[in-house]
């Protein structure tokens, strides 16, 4: 869909909504992110701040306030979470506790997003269509299988119920915005309706921008972008059942280097990225039947990237991955007297990946045509024994990988255990300890890749790669207080320390004439994290801090993906009578002087501080309208994120000052 068409449609609906809007409830103080409910950490509903698994929830209110252009803009303030890659929006990727790419499981409405193909990104969804983002930090293979060494990110899209006013049968939300960086407009429109047990949702969102500039006033080449997302849902709620059919399509067009996530300006291509996700979900929840709470999702996720090279061979390269799968679980709740209360969650997951790489419609060995089938069986029991909560879990995965070019097929089996123990010492204090193992089977590309990497250098397949296995030890404490400074206020604090030992770490080694992936032996990542949120209704404050260290124990060199020590402070004030909110965020990042000693790439990164300011107004005479302004990087500081330290010299700097404004109307 053309960007001008999207914005025109948004403006038209904004005008209509202003004329016929219904008045929502008056603003109320928000719960802190640690009070939010998550279903990712344990596959059951739980309060994020009460868990022995560090989990942070970004809810719809925060998503709307940020007016973010990417999922990474929503999560980069979470302790231990960073983004890798230069500031080209769709090419950037998340990093959790120093691990990124296929070492993080990414799920969209319960369907796996397994796509990861060298420098091409993987978070293909507009934040305007999201109702919640959940980030689980630390190994999660017991529940989510291969890839969850660093953690898991769960994205949940909006439903009709999220945009309809109480008692309304039809309604919607329209928004439009603009930012100075890249002179970029954006817009979104969501319409919902319900009749009896049925509901329907249709939504679209998109943005476009020219090239960004960094804090020095220098253009960031090939950072222009244009993307559109479409979402449709049908819901049916007969009795205690919930059926939901969902379809999403993301399309992105830009001109950029093949290695778009690095600071390169060569090998330019016209790239079109399309992701289509179709899912059918069923769940049943009857409080009178505690042994039965099943959830099943069947899905198909297809990613297709077409690249027309503008230099060199001028070939047309195709990169596709189709994941088809089913995820089924049930939770049984029961008591066993002196043996405590139990919430036993068990189920299975099956999915099949089929990938294909082409160049001018011929096979392209840099992204080899190959398939894999995965079956996982899992069980986890949350056992409450007085003040103690013991949660053991276990998962068995079997991989069957089918190779091209006559290479041997493979099968891999892996058992992933996890156990945690929490102790409610006092009503406001819960220390915990946990042990979790994660694993990542080698990707099809790592196993079977071939062809030219760059002129004079060629990929060498390695079908003998072993799975990566991580063993994470963690200790922490959850604190929660009420009525601290005034009646009704809330304070949540989480402190944690961990050590993650990774065996058979897979690293891509670039030699004089060849590039090969190999198991390097051992890596170790240690860290401490702190997260705190306070909310008093009229004002709030928050803190997020992390300090990580990562080493390749075989070479005694630092890992390149470890972010620098960082502290983020945010605070704001709500003038509830006037509907005005003002606030700011300060990010202070230390120097990163621990980087691999690799000639020809950026090494250390300097420390920096970045201040962002924001304000919004919901007029008392028009409570369905929200106007917002923000200034990112107020002092136009020039800086580089520490996870870019493997980029070629000279490396790019982050975007400079950015002034944003938006208008949102509910009707």
Question: For each of these PLM feature ranges, what is it?
Answer:
Residues 1-78, 163-164, 192-193, 228, ...:
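N-terminal Sec signal peptide and the immediately downstream disordered periplasmic leader
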Residues 30-165, 475:
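Acidic, small-polar-rich N-terminal luminal/periplasmic segments of exported/outer-membrane proteins
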Residues 160-162, 169-172, 179-182, 189-273, ...:
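Periplasmic-side early beta-strands and strand-to-turn transitions of outer-membrane beta-barrels
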Residues 176, 202, 293-309, 432-434, ...:
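Membrane-embedded beta-barrel scaffold of Gram-negative outer-membrane proteins
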Residues 212-217, 221-227, 240-291, 301-323, ...:
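Flexible loop and strand-edge segments within Gram-negative outer membrane beta-barrel domains
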Residues 251-264, 400-402, 423, 427-474, ...:
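Surface-exposed extracellular loop regions of Gram-negative outer-membrane beta-barrel proteins
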Residues 431, 439, 537, 576, ...:
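C-terminal beta-signal and adjacent terminal beta-strands/loops
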Residues 487-502, 518-597, 635-638:
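Gram-negative outer-membrane beta-barrel transporters
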